[in-house]
């Protein structure tokens, strides 16, 4: 497969994970897409940095936000790595990080990098704007007396 064709195939695998696993909760597809020895280099709290930990995280998110879905804004490839910038959406219908359901609609941005080798997702690095999510469900409210600082030029 040419470099461009393999890049497009890798993007399609990551997109399929985003749409079918995260967005629809299809864990049969999860088993198909993730390598047995998958490593999450930026695991979330209370998860393990392996395939089981990511499966647990995805299931937890779908329980808290049953209509969880993502809008992919763009994807780039570099070798076997696919970087995806997306916005997640959902409705807070289940407990999340100790916060009871608020039934509020949420959204937050995320950037993920996934390595794809031999048609399988082998590695993940990612950052998500969880502070924004927590603010939307009342999990973090800045104190009224918090000092306001101006940025220096």
Each PLM stretch: what is its role?
Residues 1-153:
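C-terminal and inter-domain tail/linker signature
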